[in-house]
C-alpha cells in the first residue's frame, strides 16, 4: 500500500531529470510533504504527438463508468498481480494509459503491536536523493452532473523488498529509469515485458527513517514532516 507521498522538488529540475517536453506548459503545483489520496499528483504521460508531457491528475483512478467520485478512495493503489483484470483498472491498461507518477518519496506505518493499535510512521526515499518515479495508470472521467472532465491516476504496488518488509506487506512499484520509455509507450514492448517491470526495488536503492506522528494528520503538509526523529 502507498497512501501518502511527498513532492517538494523544484519543477525546473524535475522537467530536466524526467526529460519532459520543454514546450509543454508547466503544471501548477505546490510543494507538499504529505499528499493523501484525491490530492493532485504530478505525472508524465505520452501525448498524442509522442512527447513526454507533464500533467496534474487527481490521485485515485476514476474509471469512465464510475457514477461518482467516491470510488477514488479505493483506487489510489492497484495491485500489480491483478490490475489487468480488475474492472476499475483494466480499461486503462488495455488502452495503454500508463503514466509515471513523480514523487520525492512516500510514508509507511509500521505496526508496533500485534493488533496495530500503535504505529510508527517512516519516510522512504531514494538512497541517492533522486526522484522516486512510480508506475501508474491514468484515466479520464466525465462528471455526469457538471459535465467536467477529470483526469485521475493510480499507483501500482507489488510485494515488498527486504527493507520495506520490515514496515508493510506492499510497496509501490518504483520504475528503473531505463524502463520509463517502454512504460510510457515511447518504445514498444510486449505486455509480458511491461508486467515484468512491476517488481520490488533492490534494497540498496532505498533509505528509510522514522518521522513524527504528525504526518498521520493530512492537515499537516510542511517540510518538518519528513525530518528524522
Identify the residue ranges that each predicted region occupies.
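Short linear sequence motif anchored by a di-proline
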Residues: 1-229
Amino acid at each position: 500500500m502507498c497512501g501518502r507521498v511527498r513532492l517538494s522538488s523544484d519543477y525546473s529540475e524535475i522537467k530536466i531529470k524526467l526529460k519532459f517536453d520543454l514546450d509543454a506548459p508547466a503544471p501548477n503545483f505546490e510543494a507538499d510533504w504529505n499528499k493523501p489520496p484525491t490530492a493532485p499528483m504530478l505525472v508524465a504521460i505520452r501525448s498524442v504527438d509522442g512527447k513526454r508531457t507533464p500533467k496534474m491528475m487527481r490521485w485515485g483512478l476514476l474509471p469512465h463508468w464510475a457514477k461518482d467520485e467516491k470510488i477514488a478512495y479505493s483506487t489510489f493503489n492497484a495491485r500489480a498481480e491483478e490490475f489487468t483484470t480488475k474492472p476499475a483498472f483494466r480499461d486503462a491498461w488495455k488502452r495503454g494509459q500508463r503514466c509515471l507518477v513523480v514523487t520525492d518519496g512516500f510514508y509507511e506505518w509500521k505496526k508496533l503491536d500485534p493488533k496495530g493499535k500503535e504505529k510508527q510512521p517512516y519516510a522512504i526515499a531514494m538512497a541517492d536523493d533522486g526522484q522516486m518515479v512510480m508506475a501508474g495508470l491514468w484515466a479520464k472521467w466525465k462528471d455526469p452532473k457538471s459535465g467536467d472532465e477529470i483526469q485521475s491516476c493510480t499507483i501500482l504496488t507489488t510485494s515488498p523488498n527486504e527493507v520495506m518488509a520490515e514496515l508493510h506487506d506492499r510497496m509501490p512499484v518504483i520504475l528503473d529509469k531505463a524502463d520509463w520509455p517502454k512504460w510510457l509507450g515511447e518504445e514498444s514492448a510486449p505486455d509480458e515485458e511491461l508486467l515484468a517491470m512491476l517488481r520490488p526495488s533492490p534494497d540498496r536503492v532505498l533509505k528509510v527513517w522514522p518521522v513524527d506522528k504528525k504526518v498521520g494528520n493530512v492537515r499537516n503538509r510542511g517540510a518538518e514532516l519528513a525530518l528524522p526523529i
